[in-house]
Amino acid sequence: MLVFKRGIHVVPKLPNSKALLQNGVPNILSSSGFKTVWFDYQRYLCDKLTLATAGQSLESYYPFHILLKTAGNPLQSNIFNLASSIHNNHLFVENILPSAVEHGTNSNAVVKTEPSRLFLSKIKDSFNGSDWEVVKEEMIYRAENEVLGQGWLFLVENNEKKLFILTSNNNGTPYYFPRNQSFDLNSAISIDEFATLKQMKELIGKSTKLNGKVQDWTMPIICVNLWDHAYLHDYGVGNRSKYVKNVLDNLNWSVVNNRIFSGISK
């Protein structure tokens, strides 16, 4: 039996797209801001990825699989950057969408969600007893100070099921640590950062010799888009920290809670 995969990359349809186009994402993005982030820029990226992979075996894969297949090949950096950006932006939009939009005149009303006990417990275990409010402040600080240009802010879960904060420059991915781009190599780096890069290089070399590939089980739990187009329309040049705070204060916890490993098969 022949199995056909899709050969073109398109922006996924959102169940409440009409309300989002009209009202935006409450407390985070205006209708125009959301239109830019999702309907305009995501479509632009999808069109570029379609052209970049046309006629190749990669064209039939989803962006997630494309970024994994191209992350280790410098000759495919263009394709990797497009696929990684598409996937990251999908993660971002997914975790800010309102849980539900009520029908009627007050279409801005949403169902409030809360972080699960498992999430809050993992936060305390992973950050030396700190609560979520403290971790949020740390995420805001690191977004402002570690990503000076374009990039992404993540809260991720590693292979030991511990949570940690990851900042990625440009189109870095949390799934493959040699390409998470947590350091901006276009500028000077500290001695500690150099030591980390050296350790990473040694680990990559060791892993490659053992089985020919690098294994990374890091999974993103929260994603914030730090690219200029995501916030400039609504927040202006000097208010990226306010934007990040609004995102972290208004997450769709139904989505975030489901991203955490619970150890229970569903």
UniProtKB/Swiss-Prot annotation:
Biological role = Component of the mitochondrial ribosome (mitoribosome), a dedicated translation machinery responsible for the synthesis of mitochondrial genome-encoded proteins, including at least some of the essential transmembrane subunits of the mitochondrial respiratory chain. The mitoribosomes are attached to the mitochondrial inner membrane and translation products are cotranslationally integrated into the membrane.
User: What gene is this protein a product of?
Assistant: RSM26
Which organism does this sequence originate in? Saccharomyces cerevisiae (strain ATCC 204508 / S288c)
Give one Pfam hit by family name.
Sod_Fe_C
Tell me the SUPFAM superfamilies matching this sequence: Fe,Mn superoxide dismutase (SOD), C-terminal domain, Fe,Mn superoxide dismutase (SOD), N-terminal domain
List other remarks: Present with 2060 molecules/cell in log phase SD medium.
GO CC annotation: cytoplasm; mitochondrial inner membrane; mitochondrial small ribosomal subunit; mitochondrion
Q: Which Gene3D superfamilies match?
A: Iron/manganese superoxide dismutase, C-terminal domain (3.55.40.20)
The entry sums up its family as follows:
Belongs to the mitochondrion-specific ribosomal protein mS42 family.
Indicate what this protein is called per its UniProt record.
Small ribosomal subunit protein mS42
Subunit structure as annotated in this protein's UniProt entry: Component of the mitochondrial small ribosomal subunit (mt-SSU). Mature yeast 74S mitochondrial ribosomes consist of a small (37S) and a large (54S) subunit. The 37S small subunit contains a 15S ribosomal RNA (15S mt-rRNA) and 34 different proteins. The 54S large subunit contains a 21S rRNA (21S mt-rRNA) and 46 different proteins. mS42 forms a heterodimer with mS43, building a large protuberance adjacent to the mRNA channel exit in the mt-SSU body.
| GO terms classed as biological process | mitochondrial translation
Q: Keyword annotations for this protein?
A: Mitochondrion, Ribonucleoprotein, Ribosomal protein
Q: Where in the cell is it found?
A: Mitochondrion
The source's superkingdom equals Eukaryota
The terms under GO molecular function for this entry are:
metal ion binding; structural constituent of ribosome; superoxide dismutase activity
